[in-house]
Design a protein with these regions (language model features):
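Short beta-strand element of the alpha/beta-hydrolase
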Residues: 81-82, 92-101
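N-terminal cap/lid segment of alpha/beta-hydrolase-fold proteins
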Residues: 43-90
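C-terminal catalytic histidine-bearing segment of alpha/beta-hydrolase fold enzymes
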Residues: 291-357
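Cap/lid segment of the alpha/beta-hydrolase catalytic domain
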Residues: 103-165
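Short alpha-helix in the alpha/beta-hydrolase fold that links the catalytic acid
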Residues: 111-114, 272, 285-295
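Gly/Ser-rich "nucleophile elbow"/oxyanion-hole loop immediately N-terminal to the catalytic nucleophile
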Residues: 148-192
Length: 357
């Protein structure tokens, strides 16, 4: 009975609403004044390639590539490290850049990088960025003894956030030099923290043609002030040490992470080529943060789950019927591969209105 109840619970996590992008009703977004926060002067990287003999896939040559970051990215050796799934097929192919959830879960990026490569059968090149080091070391920040150490720790974390965004832009520089990559069809996908990073990259780099943001948001200071679990542990520990209330904490991160807010780059996104996946009961990304990202990106296509922050990831598993994975793949097929807009999507048809499954 316990197993049956568990399967029923997990299977229920496939319920969601799929909303189409409506260009007729979308409002024109004013172009923001853009500070050059994510600018850089480093040349296009020339990565070292290394073999991955036990990670090969049919239709691909899978190898590793790495090069020094031009910033301080907090990753091992201060390197940019990625797995490159290069198609064996002739001709220029699109590139999908898959972002990690730094120093946290590898499951979502593993499913998308390996799964989409196999799904397309060699019609897309895939670059899976690695992320073994944290951007925000929650436990280290939680243990700061005083305000000076707190400022230093947050400054370093925000610097790493900016650094990995620049690392991604330099991966795009590299992609433009590759004869097998069609650099007019570059997509990016991020999850949670990397959805936030990815949205800042897309808002600053017009070479990003297609973007998927899974369980991300804007207004990162609200996330810092309201997210649960390890972020809440850090917040409570620091607040006790510094004798701050929640609003002081929120105000501090509003200043420190002002350039990490995707809403700054409104008017720079391509809403017709953007997919947002969110949870209406997300206990890490507040409602105002979710709404701000949706509005800043031009009210694009959106999938909404009625769950918390982690439950939609269950829809990327066989128990959850891979519903979320299939929706993401179908969107990428349409945008990167030019599949027909009216292609049937499993058990539902995406229309100009809303479709609920």
């Amino acid at each position: 009975m316990l197993c049956i109840a568990l399967v029923a619970l997990l299977s229920a996590c496939t319920t969601h609403e799929h909303q189409a992008y409506n260009s007729a009703s979308a409002q024109a977004m004013p172009v923001s004044q853009l500070p050059d926060y994510y600018g850089y002067h480093a040349p296009a990287p020339q990565p070292e390639h290394y073999e991955l003999p036990f990670q090969q896939l049919d239709g691909y040559r899978v190898s590793g590539l790495r090069f020094p970051s031009s910033e301080q990215n907090g990753q091992p050796g201060n390197l940019v490290d990625a797995r490159y799934f290069q198609s064996d097929h002739s001709g220029r192919k699109p590139l999908l850049i898959v972002l990690p959830i730094w120093a946290t879960h590898t499951f979502p990026s593993t499913v998308i990088s390996n799964g989409y490569a196999l799904h397309t059968g060699g019609e897309v090149n895939v670059l899976w960025m690695q992320g073994d080091g944290p951007l925000f070391d929650w436990f280290e920040i939680a243990d700061v003894p005083d305000e000076e150490h707190f400022h230093d720790a947050v400054d370093e974390a925000v610097g790493r956030f900016r650094a990995v965004a620049i690392d991604i832009r330099r991966l795009i520089d590299w992609a433009e030099t590759r004869p097998e990559i069609d650099s007019s069809r570059i997509g990016i996908i991020g999850f949670s923290m990397s959805a936030l990073v990815g949205a800042n990259v897309a808002g600053n780099d017009p070479r990003v043609d297609t973007a998927v943001y899974v369980l991300g948001g804007a207004r990162p200071w609200d996330m810092m002030a309201e997210c649960n679990l390890v972020v809440e542990y850090m917040r409570k520990s620091v607040s006790d040490t510094l004798e701050w209330d929640q609003e002081q904490y929120r105000a501090y991160f509003r200043e420190q992470m002002r350039y990490g807010d995707p809403a700054l780059w409104r008017g720079q996104y391509r809403p017709q080529n953007t997919l947002i996946v969110e949870s209406s009961k997300d206990d890490c990304i507040p409602g105002d943060s979710r709404a701000s990202l949706f509005q800043a990106t031009g009210e694009p296509e959106r999938v909404v789950y009625p769950y918390n922050h982690w439950q939609p990831f269950l829809a990327m598993t066989p128990v959850g019927r891979n519903v979320l994975t299939r929706d993401i793949f179908e969107f990428l097929d349409r945008k990167l591969l030019g599949s027909r807009e009216d292609t049937h999507r499993g058990s539902h048809q995406l229309t100009g209105g809303k479709s609920v499954r």
